[in-house]
Amino acid sequence: MAERHTIADSKRAFHQAFPHVIAPLYRRIADELLVELHLLSHQATFQANSLFAVGLKTVFERFTQGYRPMEHPAALLSALCSSNGFDDEQLKQAAQHCLQDAEGHSDDAFQSWLKEQSLSDGAHYSRLMAVGLLALLEASSDESDASSLRQRAVKLSVDLGLPAERVEKDLTVFSSNSERMEQAVELMQETLAADRRKKEKRLAEAAESTAG
């Protein structure tokens, strides 16, 4: 029987795969996903289905917006996955394929197609599946009201074998955290822009002083 990896093992493997400093704004999502993927890797009944793949892609992209340098997020996701036995390329391809399929269906056809993504009997639920369902609804619908989309996701979750109460709670938390993240990124970008303007002003003043 293979040795069971601990969270310390996963963290060690992660830092070896991603030996970069993570800014405080993004450290929380990195820590949360590392722990979540670690726990899921030990769930015998967990299946990394399409809903999970879309949810992981959505959560990661939502909470790493504004990340610098721009080439680091891909490496960060790869490290989070590989340190817990997941294949990030396979998951990204599954998510992209699923999102493209969702965009190509009419409303009725979408619901029929969506049932193909149902959770198998007895399979372990992950909050990322709820986010994946919401993302598929966003991709397939012209509906722009976030609350309406969440309510629809909760209703559809029953037919997909997902626990509706947990889906509702998980999507409410996801929505709230997304709003806070957007505000934090906006504030960070405004602060960086202000710092750049101050630096440019100092350089201009120094140049004028030298010229004079």
Swiss-Prot record:
Residues 179-201 form a coiled coil. The keyword NAD does not apply. InterPro entries: Thf1 (IPR017499). One of its GO terms (biological process) is photosystem II assembly. GO terms for cellular component: plasma membrane-derived thylakoid photosystem II. It comes from the Bacteria. Keywords: Coiled coil. Belongs to the THF1 family. May be involved in photosynthetic membrane biogenesis. PANTHER family: PROTEIN THYLAKOID FORMATION 1, CHLOROPLASTIC (PTHR34793:SF1). This is Protein Thf1.
